């Protein structure tokens, strides 16, 4: 048997910038080295607790649960609706560059720490200290000790009192922030139909059936007998489909064509050969789980996309990427090319990760000479 | 659940292990140090220094007094857990890839690597579970693996058998007393090495993980495959949870293959399967690299995973985890409850 205590912290913090009366309230920070979950494990608190209970420090199995609790930056009444939550004590202070010019020698006098016992049994501790920037930091903590008993294996309890050794020998009680931190909350709910939820592609019966169907079929062009769909044939415009010579192959090829079209479209929808717009292709089919082009970019893309015109026919996507990469991270380069000849059509779209980079690039690259032509760069208009 | 991140290592984790009470977690990595952590809040208790090479393996005796570690500096070392003091060093011709204490802690086995003309061996050392006792230099037993080297090994119940997993995907059973080979059964796909072997709490069956993307539950007595858990990625580790009938698998693309695979993510997730129904019930993400090792808390309250990214993550389960039951399990539970009430009223 041993006793443990849960604490309540209410923290108010005021930074006094040297030679100014401005009180700065730092923005609340979540995670990082100021992770609030450590408040109940901060060295002073822990020591206090051990001395009070003299058995072991903390047996709360989920010590970090409380780190989602909001940061309170004003002194508040200590009555708490949730007596077991632990409010944070972000003791460390973020360095603010705005304070740099005010860095001067300050008096190191600090007011003595105060300890007030409140009527409701909680304790208020006000402490002052200097942070790394020489600023005075006032930390107000409201603490209430709630003792709850928990049965712990005596061997485990004994081990909790062991002194630290090795690289941890200088660490105080409680987790050291340089080795232990708290990750983002993970929602893990076991579910027996987990696989169905995740839409596993290999288990999709439609896709599997289509794959089986196409396994021993070969794609054959009706125009040139090449290994591509007739619609993709480079000689589509210049040659007529092979007549008598290809007639025998025709039947098999067209069947393959149709099957292929169906696999591209709604697989197994039953409407063979009917046109499926690209946006709907893959619905329920093999590509359902895959990414769709443009879907990743969406609206955001239009804001940081440049249209580049008067591009040389010889231009390559990589060249454009290299040119525009100088201004920031380029997420996408699209250079329109003629399908038959492979030459550039003379315009391109460049998407930046950041709009400000796009603005810079637009200003700099408009009128830039590239391969004997003068580029025209403007923001892309929203697609109709 | 909010995982606790332990960043005590600078290189990839190789093994993590809970002690029997589940309050301490030991971790070893390729950066030559051993860390011990309090499992409930992630506080580091200490580190053990002395190894001169990557540490491949670690084990803790059942009373949590002595720690054994095996390293690429060709040694097995014993440590006093409480203080970090080095107690004993055994030298071997090659690296030590796995150590494990027997159920009572009186014996320690070590698996040595096949290299430089030396065959892979399994050595057994007698251990005195006392930090002040003089440990014997002599090896109690040496088993030479002539066909395929052993990658992992462990002691069955009552130290009756030594079970070894091999590089060629087979599992062997040796007599625990004299080291005779009793069985060698191809369990996993040929030439897909077995990467991990962890025991159930009573050591009557164990789980293996293999690069052939499956994990299997096998009995210790006759090496019968009870269950198979298929995954879609090479597995590095597998463990059996207490309290709930689950198994946890860890794996992911090998670090060297990550850049060459097209997968949007490298599948660096811990996978939970139901131990009996063999179906996957969920995944936990978080690591940036493949999971090299997973370990389940013997009290069933948490599990930890160590990754190629150098982090150990301890996860304390939420209520939803403990409440989860299959329909048949729930029915059975209800029936049992009813019976109990009837006996009480009668």
Swiss-Prot record, chain B:
Covalent S-S links between cysteines: none
Keywords: Cytoplasm, Initiation factor, Protein biosynthesis, Repeat, WD repeat
GO cellular component: eukaryotic 43S preinitiation complex; eukaryotic 48S preinitiation complex; eukaryotic translation initiation factor 3 complex, eIF3e; eukaryotic translation initiation factor 3 complex, eIF3m; nuclear periphery
Recorded superkingdom: Eukaryota
WD repeats: 8-49, 50-91, 145-184, 189-228, 286-325
Location in or out of the cell: Cytoplasm
GO biological process, one term: cytoplasmic translational initiation
Coiled-coil parts of chain: none
InterPro entries: eIF3i, WD40/YVTN_repeat-like_dom_sf, WD40_repeat_CS, WD40_repeat_dom_sf, WD40_rpt
Pfam families tied to this protein: EIF3I
GO molecular function: RNA binding; translation initiation factor activity
Function as written in the Swiss-Prot or TrEMBL entry: Component of the eukaryotic translation initiation factor 3 (eIF-3) complex, which is involved in protein synthesis of a specialized repertoire of mRNAs and, together with other initiation factors, stimulates binding of mRNA and methionyl-tRNAi to the 40S ribosome. The eIF-3 complex specifically targets and initiates translation of a subset of mRNAs involved in cell proliferation.
Subunit structure: Component of the eukaryotic translation initiation factor 3 (eIF-3) complex.
Family the UniProt entry places it in: Belongs to the eIF-3 subunit I family.
Protein name: Eukaryotic translation initiation factor 3 subunit I
Organism: Neurospora crassa (strain ATCC 24698 / 74-OR23-1A / CBS 708.71 / DSM 1257 / FGSC 987)
Origin organism lineage: Eukaryota, Fungi, Dikarya, Ascomycota, Pezizomycotina
Gene name per UniProt: tif-34
């Amino acid at each position: 048997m041993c006793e443990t205590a849960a604490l309540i912290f209410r923290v108010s913090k005021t930074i006094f910038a040297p030679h100014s009366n401005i009180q700065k309230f730092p923005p609340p920070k979540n995670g990082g080295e100021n992770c609030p979950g450590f408040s109940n494990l901060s060295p002073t608190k822990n020591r206090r607790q051990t001395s009070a209970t003299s058995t072991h420090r903390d047996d709360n199995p989920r010590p970090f649960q409380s780190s989602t609790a909001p940061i309170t930056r004003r002194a508040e009444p200590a009555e708490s609706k949730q007596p077991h939550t632990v409010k944070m004590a972000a003791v460390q202070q973020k360095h603010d560059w705005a304070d740099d010019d005010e860095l001067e020698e300050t008096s190191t006098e600090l007011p003595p720490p105060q300890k007030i016992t409140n009527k409701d049994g909680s304790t208020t501790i006000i402490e002052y200290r200097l942070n790394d920037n020489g600023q005075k930091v006032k930390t107000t903590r409201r603490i209430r000790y709630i003792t709850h008993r928990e049965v712990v294996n005596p061997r485990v309890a004994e081990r909790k009192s062991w002194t630290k050794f090795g690289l941890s020998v200088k660490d105080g009680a409680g987790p050291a922030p340089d080795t232990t931190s708290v990750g983002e909350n993970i929602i893990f709910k076991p579910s027996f139909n987990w696989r169905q939820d995740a839409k596993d592609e290999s288990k999709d019966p439609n896709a599997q059936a289509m794959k089986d169907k196409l396994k021993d079929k070969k794609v054959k062009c009706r125009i040139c007998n090449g290994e591509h769909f007739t619609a993709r044939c480079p000689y589509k415009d210049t040659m007529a489909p092979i007549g008598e010579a290809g007639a025998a192959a025709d039947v098999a090829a067209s069947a393959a064509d149709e099957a292929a079209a169906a696999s591209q479209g709604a697989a197994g929808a039953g409407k063979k050969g009917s046109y499926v717009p690209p946006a709907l292709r893959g619905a329920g089919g093999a590509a359902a789980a895959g990414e769709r082009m443009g879907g990743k970019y969406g609206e955001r893309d239009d804001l940081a996309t440049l249209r580049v015109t008067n591009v040389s026919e010889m231009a390559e996507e990589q060249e454009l990427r290299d040119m525009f990469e100088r201004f920031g991270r380029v997420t996408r380069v699209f250079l329109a090319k003629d399908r038959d000849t492979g030459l550039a059509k003379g315009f391109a779209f460049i998407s930046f990760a950041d709009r400000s980079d796009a603005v810079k690039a637009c200003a700099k690259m408009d009128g830039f000479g590239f391969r004997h032509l003068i580029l025209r760069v403007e923001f892309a208009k929203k697609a109709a | 659940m909010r995982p606790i991140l332990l960043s005590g290592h600078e290189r990839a984790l190789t093994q993590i292990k809970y002690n029997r009470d589940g309050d301490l977690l030991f971790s070893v990595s390729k950066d030559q140090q051993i860390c011990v952590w309090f499992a409930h809040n992630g506080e580091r208790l200490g580190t053990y220094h002395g190894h001169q090479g990557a540490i491949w393996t670690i084990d803790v005796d059942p009373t949590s007094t002595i720690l054994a570690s095996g390293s690429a500096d060709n040694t097995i070392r014993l440590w006093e857990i409480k203080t970090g003091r080095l107690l004993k060093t055994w030298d071997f011709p090659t690296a030590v890839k796995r150590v494990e204490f027997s159920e009572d802690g009186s014996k320690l086995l070590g698996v040595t690597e096949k290299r430089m003309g030396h065959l892979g061996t399994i050595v057994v050392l007698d251990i005195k579970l006392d930090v002040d006792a003089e440990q014997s230099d002599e090896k109690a037993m040496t088993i030479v693996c002539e066909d395929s080297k052993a990658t992992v090994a462990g002691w069955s119940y009552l130290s009756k058998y030594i079970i070894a997993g091999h590089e060629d995907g087979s599992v062997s059973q040796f007599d625990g007393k004299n080291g005779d080979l009793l069985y060698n059964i191809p369990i996993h796909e040929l030439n897909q090495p077995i990467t991990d072997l962890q025991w159930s709490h009573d050591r009557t069956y164990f789980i293996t993980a293999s690069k052939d993307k499956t994990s299997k539950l096998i009995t210790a007595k006759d090496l019968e495959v009870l269950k198979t858990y298929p995954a879609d990625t090479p597995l590095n580790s597998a463990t059996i949870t207490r309290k709930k009938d689950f198994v946890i698998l860890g794996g992911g693309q090998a670090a060297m293959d990550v850049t060459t695979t097209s997968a949007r993510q490298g599948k660096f997730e811990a996978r939970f399967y139901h131990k009996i129904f063999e179906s996957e019930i969920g995944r936990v993400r978080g690591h940036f690299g493949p999971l090299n090792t997973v370990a389940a808390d013997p009290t069933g309250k948490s599990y930890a995973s160590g990754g190629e990214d150098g982090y150990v993550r301890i996860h304390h389960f939420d209520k939803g985890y403990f409440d989860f039951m299959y329909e048949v399990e729930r029915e059975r539970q209800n029936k049992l409850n009813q019976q109990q009430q009837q006996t009480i009223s009668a």
